[in-house]
Amino acid sequence: GVPCLCDSDGPSVRGNTLSGTVWVFGCPSGWHICTSDGPTIGSCCKK
């Protein structure tokens, strides 16, 4: 999957670990959305 920036990772992608994964059709079972304002396409989810 494509990595994405969770709220807990910091304010920007520079120098921060991207702990989320983009899921186009929503988070799979056992995962949760980790952003307050999600990406334009899909959801940024983490385990």
Swiss-Prot record:
A single GO molecular function term of this UniProt record: toxin activity
Entry keywords, A to Z: Disulfide bond, Ion channel impairing toxin, Nematocyst, Neurotoxin, Secreted, Toxin, Voltage-gated sodium channel impairing toxin
Site, as annotated: Important for toxin activity on Nav channels: N16
Paired cysteines (S-S): C4-C44, C6-C34, C27-C45
Keyword field contains Metal-binding: no
Domain of life according to the entry: Eukaryota
Major localisation: secreted
Compartment(s) of residence: Secreted; Nematocyst
Biological process according to GO: regulation of signal transduction
Alphabetized InterPro entries for the sequence: Anenome_toxin (IPR000693), Myo_ane_neurotoxin_sf (IPR023355)
CC annotations in GO: extracellular region; nematocyst
Miscellaneous field: Negative results: does not show activity on Nav1.7/SCN9A.
Function: Binds to the sodium channels Nav1.1/SCN1A (EC(50)=453 nM), Nav1.5/SCN5A (EC(50)=440 nM) and Nav1.6/SCN8A (EC(50)=1740 nM), thereby delaying their inactivation. Also inhibits Nav1.2/SCN2A, Nav1.3/SCN3A, and Nav1.4/SCN4A, but to a lesser extent. Toxin effect on Nav1.1 and Nav1.6 (and on Nav1.5, but in a lesser extent) consists in an incomplete inactivation.
Sequence similarity: Belongs to the sea anemone sodium channel inhibitory toxin family. Type I subfamily.
Annotated protein name in UniProt: Delta-actitoxin-Bcg1d
Organism: Bunodosoma cangicum
